[in-house]
Structure formats: structure tokens, C-alpha cells
Amino acid sequence: MNIESKIKEFTDQLNQFAYEYYTLDEPSVEDSEYDRLYHELVKLEQENPQLVRADSPTHWTGGVILDGFVKFRHPYNLYSLGDVFSREELALWEERVRKEIVNPEYICELKIDGLSLSLYYENGLLVTAATRGDGTTGENITENVKRIKDVPLKLKEAIDIVVRGEAYLPRQNFAKLNAERELAGAAPFANPRNAAAGTLRQLDTKIVAKRGLATFLYQEASPATNDTQEEVLEYFEELGFQVNPERKFARNLDEIWEFIEEATRLRDELPYDIDGVVIKVNNLAEQEELGFTVKAPRWAIAYKFPAEQAETEILSVDWTVGRTGVVTPTANMTPVLLAQTTVARATLHNVDYIQEKDIRNHDKVMIYKAGDIIPKVGKVLLEKRKPAKHLRKTHRANKYVWTRFGRRSVEKGLVFSKREDNRVKIPTQCPECDSDLIHFEDEVALRCVNPLCPAQIREKLIHFASRDAMNIVGLGPSVISQLFDKKLVTDVADLYQLTVEDLLTLDKVKETLAQKIVSAIAQSRENSAEKLLFGLGIRHVGGKAAKLLLERFANLRALSQASEEEISEIPSLGGVIATAVVSYFETAGAKTLLDELENAGLNFAYLGAVNVEGILSGKTVVLTGKLTTLKRKEAKEKLEALGANVSGSVSKKTDLVVAGEEAGSKLTKAQDLGIEIWSEQDLLDL
């Protein structure tokens, strides 16, 4: 391929990737692959400037506007950032800055992996919020942004200002959202960034409010009245904006690199995703002096973390059944080290995912961790796929191969039909109960609809006992599986008939654990009814929906007799949930189960929110480091019970930091700011 053809191919590919990323929010390649192609194109264009195309992505910032949203023309150009991937490349950028500026100073900020947006305020009131789009024209998403709780609708000062920032979905909210989507049979989002982008493009503002987006603001797009970037960020905090406290003042490359190394270590601790560090010249007058290229400011650069991937082989695919009947494929792989953990299994999501990527048994694949948490298959290495050796199926051929190779014929991949036997076999029957699987038109999932499917019953029991439902401590998946296999428990009502003697028949269950479980089961009878409702596992009814339903009807019995119209009147709940609830309680099985649970002494009443005026009432508290006695969620719940507002980052507004072992930058920053420090034991002593 000649140079001109290669430039054309790279340009077309990158423009398509940019469209998928910026406009559709459905990227088909990893950032690292895009960056590799982009830098190859830059190199080719530098060597052959006469061949640069007018639509080259090196001249613009990508994206077009979907017809479904009103276009918004930005009064200021919203530039993207240039990026570097090594200390050497960063040093070259810093050297260029020093050629223009004497003794420059820098501000280093975390690069949030979210969706860029701009907020327009007039006389202190939010009038417009828009996506960045292509840098000149974006989408008006004002009503959706108003549903983000940390975006101030009115500033502390009555000023006109345009600010830029990033909308993101915290990891905890992302996990909750995907869990809800899985229960509803919807495809999970690939990562928090895609989820944030998809949320801001929702036409139903109630969905936006429910998902819990957050923001960090980082730049004034309108002419700034401050002298430095550091002052801009402090001013933003005074106005009421959320500003990321994880930032550092630096005077040279070494200090910049120290922050990058700290950010790399901090990455897994953060409650949100980051994909790098942004370095900016601190002085705004010097920023103006340095100016811009066609695409990016010369006074700022983004250092991007390398995407960690690993190559492995898919050995086989298992199909498992969840409590709602969704049948999910999981790849068994040759164990490989990825992001400091050994990975041997990865989700394949659904049939569509397998077929779109053409995933087959014994394929070599690249895997990565979505959000650095969930192992996923990213790319099939087709060039390493071993083709099957097809032989004409004859008796003579069979006899020859068996005589010549014996059992090794299997190892050599010799097959005697046109069927490609490495393709993943899509099940037509449930792997647990052999019932026919259903593929509904509005779903991507295969589903077992047999209410007596053992796997579904087992998973429903596990869900019922889980922390967010009835919170029966000690009654985990292993114990429940044994109880189910021994037929000691066949539905959730049976749990309340268990005795210590029953539990002692199980493997690895001793007297102490058995007593603990029986006590926890008894205690769960007194839970507020929304916990019980969530534990029943009604499709589309998550924890928040369960609470809203019980707030309205006050009692589980009353809810079980409600109509779809009555339920649909509840704000934030729609017809889908109303239909699901009514349909569930109309079944004979549900009516019988309610009677059994009531006879077992379970509370059916909504007990209401517990308002605790504790010693930490109104205080902002940050947890950091490794806790040895409490789980992090337990510590958070205890702090909230004492009246505290638990935050994920240290700032001037922080009142207290609870520091466990190996506490890092948050503890250091708290000490620098003179914030009170507690140990885990101090918290336990309360």
C-alpha cells in the first residue's frame, strides 16, 4: 500500500472511530488503538504534508450532532487536549513551554473519564448546559443537567460566566445501574463513561435524576477574571461548583511526574474513573501568550494512562441462569495476570455480543478490565485463529486418520464435516432445567421462563438473604446452595423454619456459625417492609423503587392489592414497574408466599426513615486507607448513622478524616490542611 492510500485509510478509520466515540457513544475500539492510529497518521502527514486531507482528524476534534437534540452553537471554541503517553513525550512538551515562558509553573489535575460539558450562567442562574460536540456546536442538554444534584442552578454570586467540566457516573452508581439493567434483561453499559453519555442523552429526565450523575468543573471558558488556574478552581468552589480536590502545584517535570505516579497509585481508590492527568500552565496570562494550535491549547497537555490488556485463550463457554431467568455466557480462559489479579473468567454478556465479535472456542483474545474491575473480552486475534483441517467424510478417511493418529486426531483439529466445531454453541434449552429458552423481541438476553427452574430458585434465595435485601449475615451463596441441594429450603419462606440442627448437617458449618445464622434470620423478621419487597426479586423493582412503593402504600399487603393506575401515580415510577408489581402479586405462588411469610412473623409495615441526630451531625467525613475490622460499607453506614455526610475526597470543607492502614494522599492532604484525623479504633469506640 502506498503512502497516499495509507493516509486515506487512516483518515477514514479515525473519522469513523471519532463518530462512534463522540456522537454515538458506542466506541468500537479501545482508546489505545485509536491513539496508536492517530499518532501514525500524524507522523505520515508530517513527512508528507502535500498529502494531508481536508477532513483529517488532526485538523478537527471529531463529532457531529444527532438529529434528536437541539443544536447549540458555543460562543467560544472548546478545544480538545493534545496527549502524551510517556515521560519522554511529556518532557518534550515541557521543553517547548520553557522556550516561550521563563520559569513556568503548572497545575496538575486528574483527567476524569466522563462526558465534557459547558454550563452557561446569566446573572448567576443556569440558563444553558451543552455537550462539547465538535468544539463549536454541541447539544442542548439543559433539562438533563438540571437533574444532576451537584450542579448549582443558582451561583453564590449574580454573575455571567461559562464554565467547562466533566459529567461522570460514580463507580458505585455504575455498578448499581448495570445490576438493575441485568435484572431488567437490558444490555449492560460497557463502562461508566458510556453510561454517563447515554444518561445525558435520555429524553426522560426522571431517568437522569435516578442514575446519580456527578460533575467536576475545571475551566472558565468565558474570559477569566483571575490570574491563575489555581485561583480559578478556588473561585469555582466559592461559587458552589464541585471541583476535584486531587490536584498539585508543580514547578518542573520531576514534580509533575510525582503527581502522575501518585495518580497511578490512587486510581483504584477513587470512587470514579480517571484515564490520565492534565497538566496546565498555571498563569493565565502565560496561557494566553502560548496560545493554541488548530486543535489544542499549547499551554496544556494530557498524560494518558496506558490501557492494560492481556492476551489469553478462550477454553470454553459456560451458560449460567440468574434469578430472573436470564441465561448469561461466561468465557473460561487460560489464567492470566491483569491489573494485579489473576483472571480466568470473563463475561460475554449475551448471544449478540458473541456473534458480533465472532468469538469462538480456542480463540486467542485480548482481555481488559472495564472500569478496571470487570474482566471483558475486547478483541479477537483473528490472525492467530487456527483453521480447522477439513477432510471429506468417508469410511476410508476415518479409518486412515484413526489408524495414523489415534486419539491425537482430536489434538490435530481434524474434522470430517463442513461444520466449524469451534463456534460457541448457543443453547436452546436451559442448562439447569432443560426448558426451552425464549428470546423476546425487545431483549438481547436468552431467558428461561420456567418458574421451577432450580438455578432461578437458588439465585432468588441468595438475593433474598443479601446485604441490600434482608441482610441475613452468614447466609451466603455456599450455605444456601447446600440448603437447596439438601431440599431443606425450596423458597424464601422455608428460611424461617431453619434450625441450628438443620444447619449443622451442612459442610463447614459449625455450632457458632449455625447459631449466628439462626439469630440473623430471626432479626430479619423485623426489617422494614421495603427490604422484604426488594428481597422478593420482582422484576424491575430495585431498592429505591421498593422504598417508594412502601412509602406510598405503607404496608406490603396494601401494595399487593394495589392497581396499576395507583402505582403509576407515584413520582419516578412508570408503567413498567406498575405492571411488573401487579403481575407478580396476581400469581397464586406470590399470594401463598405472602401468607407463609406473614405466618412466619415477618414485618409487612414500612417503618420509615430513621433520623439520627448524632455527634457527627452536619460534618463532612472522608474514609481512606485499608480498614481491618469494619468493611468500608459498614464504616460508611456507621458514620451516616452518627449524622455525618461521607465524602470521597478531601477538601477545605472536610471536617474529619478516618484513616486506616496504608492511607495515602488523602491523609497527607488532610494533615496539610489541619483537618482532624481519626483512626478506625476511634470510630469503633463511639
From Swiss-Prot:
Q: Which reaction does it catalyse?
A: NAD(+) + (deoxyribonucleotide)n-3'-hydroxyl + 5'-phospho-(deoxyribonucleotide)m = (deoxyribonucleotide)n+m + AMP + beta-nicotinamide D-nucleotide
- For the keyword Metal-binding, the answer is yes
Q: Which residues bind NAD(+)?
A: 31-35, 80-81, 109, 132, 166, 280, 304
- Gene Ontology molecular-function annotations: DNA ligase (NAD+) activity; metal ion binding
Needed cofactors, names only, are: Mg(2+); Mn(2+)
An example Gene Ontology CC term for this record: cytosol
What is this enzyme's class at the first EC digit? ligase
Q: Name the domain of life this protein comes from.
A: Bacteria
Give the protein's recorded name: DNA ligase
Q: Which organism is it from?
A: Lactococcus lactis subsp. cremoris (strain SK11)
Give the classification, highest ranks.
Bacteria, Bacillati, Bacillota, Bacilli, Lactobacillales
